[in-house]
């Protein structure tokens, strides 16, 4: 059976057993901030198992895409060198949420694996493990299924603590947990290894193919297990592993799915398709990279983006080892889409985007790879011992973008290891240097503990009556706040919008008679709305009745900007592509800021198109529609959800322009798109690798911005004695005149340098037959010094030259060595010494190098290094 047929058979079998087929969730976990990537089928059902979420079904079956690279679960360094390690894999799984339990789960697994209708695996080839004290599972396997005792293995607490076992699953130190039962396939005596639980269990003869987890306990902080009222089942079977078994091959890389990717990789690289570890690395990595990019991850220097960058660069390095010329990795995407696109349509939809991102990252890495490899080669040549120092690993990471595991790959090929502890020390030191001093206000959101949920009335009102439920001062609960005191007020009902989804919290005031509390911000913790501010007059007590008043003008301007972000988001996806995802936003009364995923700067014509599209929707003046519905219905209508946000059973769908923009949003918005009046982008730029930011203004603020721009144009025209109509012509003339003057200046400087060169050459010293000239020429820039060094090399013949200058309060250095000496003396080495002496850095070619620093007082000492440099080198 082909891998695709096995996947479909698994899903179909469990559908016949009353399971709902659920699509794979994103590789970016939406309900677990502690998890870097989705790495198991149960991740998307975590809240179901915890009893925090109810779904319309109690039985589910999935084929879940998973990534294990980075974080706790990291297979990266083993990929390509073993038969079964991958960065990306598919986990087939069936799940029961308080429905069936051990007997049915075991029966389903055995039936699917061994019946002629399904996989038809030989029963005598299957071994089973259970937790040592799980007699129930053991009896089901032996007495009902009929597995002989000699192929049953009880596994106890083999990890040094109670319930710490390969056959006991826990979600954490506390919470749902339970025993598990694993099914192993015996590849036969020709493969070395022993059955599970034996001293030889790490061999490859017995391979785990399916794990059934029985969640039947809740573990409390004291370590005691309490039975769950509704036990559940979580199972997982690796598609690649079971495919290898059914296709009668020992390595996952020999299955049909990988054969097409290996062939495509070999073709793109231009190498033979044989059993090469580097080719396996490339074929594996195209899967994880393709799926991660399709799910919205872009290469960057932190978090998930950094893991993606590491994987891409590792693939590129292994491709280069095999002889790849130029960019090749992106060319394999088409084969990935052909192999897996029918099961995962997001690959088809995002193919061109994946290719663009990979090609861009390859080209960027190529610029630094060659230089970094040369540096590493030099460091390894000087290495004493078998451990690459942490400082070297960090230098390659920090300067050349070499992930530590890429350096580790190169070291492994030479039987070297890395000083990982030293690398981490360097990283820690960098973090300390980078950490800016900052102070934070009182974090009431983590301190306030109120069971009462505030009722929000702000969608339809900006005023109202309310009762004070609680008061806080300096993080402590109090019964009253006096005049002049800052604190937090919690009401039973409020029209104040709490900061969420990028929209700032409302401001305004509360009042009752002569008591007034000025609200500067509103936030939310749990169900409670926190009104932050100060008592302007009187004394406010718990239980008091107050009138609420939101600052209307600020609210109105803010909601226009919020609605504009929705229109901008839709326009971005229309102009740039469906890969655009919101990465963050800030909406206040002055402007809007919108961060989104994109891999390159936006072109001017694209910015103009965005403005045109948004303003066209504004001019249509369509009604902004809101609807309360369930999450599944909202998604079927095409509503976009903000990634990372948690949504309840009921969600609010906001639509503009009919189907132009449909998003889940709980914010305050305009009544009609025409209320926004005008939309103008004021800036666009990058904030991180793969993340762009647009800032824009709307309404009155947009008009004010345009008026200011008009005033600047008039002022510029006045400066060049022109007007708006001929401003460009006037500026062009000024720039042309400036260019001619700069050219004349360069010619004069060249003549002066030539004259200086004649004078300087006479000052050169003879050191062991080498003319050494080291002098300072203050006021000269680097360009002038470079030209002078070239001239002096021609005049002096066999020479070493070091020139320095203090130019615009900085030290400029240029070193030159004539070609006949570069075998013994290198300009780059001299420059490193000289630049370090003035508190800077430098380097370059053996015959020419540049550098600089900040310590002008040390320039003479730096220049004095030239003579001993020659004396020691000759």
Swiss-Prot record:
EC number of the protein: 6.1.1.7
Keywords, comma-separated and alphabetical: Aminoacyl-tRNA synthetase, ATP-binding, Cytoplasm, Ligase, Metal-binding, Nucleotide-binding, Protein biosynthesis, RNA-binding, tRNA-binding, Zinc
Record's GO cellular component terms: cytosol
Signal sequence bounds: none
Stored SUPFAM superfamilies: Class II aaRS and biotin synthetases, Putative anticodon-binding domain of alanyl-tRNA synthetase (AlaRS), ThrRS/AlaRS common domain, Translation proteins
Free-text remark on how the cofactor is bound: Binds 1 zinc ion per subunit.
Domain of life, per lineage: Bacteria
A GO MF term: alanine-tRNA ligase activity
Chain segments annotated as coiled-coil in the UniProt record: none
Sequence positions that bind Zn(2+): 562, 566, 665, 669
One record GO biological process: alanyl-tRNA aminoacylation
Enzyme class per UniProt: ligase
Domain-level remarks: Consists of three domains; the N-terminal catalytic domain, the editing domain and the C-terminal C-Ala domain. The editing domain removes incorrectly charged amino acids, while the C-Ala domain, along with tRNA(Ala), serves as a bridge to cooperatively bring together the editing and aminoacylation centers thus stimulating deacylation of misacylated tRNAs.
Family according to the record: Belongs to the class-II aminoacyl-tRNA synthetase family.
Physiological role: Catalyzes the attachment of alanine to tRNA(Ala) in a two-step reaction: alanine is first activated by ATP to form Ala-AMP and then transferred to the acceptor end of tRNA(Ala). Also edits incorrectly charged Ser-tRNA(Ala) and Gly-tRNA(Ala) via its editing domain.
Protein name, entry field: Alanine--tRNA ligase
Organism: Pseudomonas savastanoi pv. phaseolicola (strain 1448A / Race 6)
